[in-house]
């Protein structure tokens, strides 16, 4: 039962997230020979105020 977690910054549309879940499921199913119904995709959308790189929040760039 594969679990795939994807973290990304806010701003993607619902259609983009829907397509991402579908396409990731396809790739994992193909490569691991796992049934699609057993693949879990977890999307973790982060606010730009809650993520930083090099000491600077993304919201401050």
From Swiss-Prot:
Q: Which family does it belong to?
A: Belongs to the 4-oxalocrotonate tautomerase family.
Protein name (database record): Probable tautomerase lmo2564
Q: Where is the active site?
A: 2 (proton acceptor)
Q: Which NCBIfam families match?
A: PRK02220.1, taut
The record's annotation in InterPro entries points to: 4-OT, 4-OT-like_dom, Tautomerase/MIF_sf
Residue ranges that the Swiss-Prot or TrEMBL entry lists as coiled coil: none
E.C. number, please?
5.3.2.-
Keyword Transferase: yes or no?
no
Name the Gene Ontology molecular function terms of this record. Answer: isomerase activity
Q: Which organism is it from?
A: Listeria monocytogenes serovar 1/2a (strain ATCC BAA-679 / EGD-e)
Q: Which UniProt keywords apply?
A: Isomerase
State if Isomerase is listed as a keyword.
yes
């Amino acid at each position: 039962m594969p679990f795939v977690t994807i973290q990304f910054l806010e701003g993607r549309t619902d259609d983009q997230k829907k397509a991402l879940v579908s396409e990731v499921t396809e790739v994992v199913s193909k490569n691991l020979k796992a049934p699609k119904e057993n693949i879990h995709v977890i999307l973790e959308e982060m606010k730009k105020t809650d993520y930083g790189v090099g000491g600077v929040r993304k919201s401050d760039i």
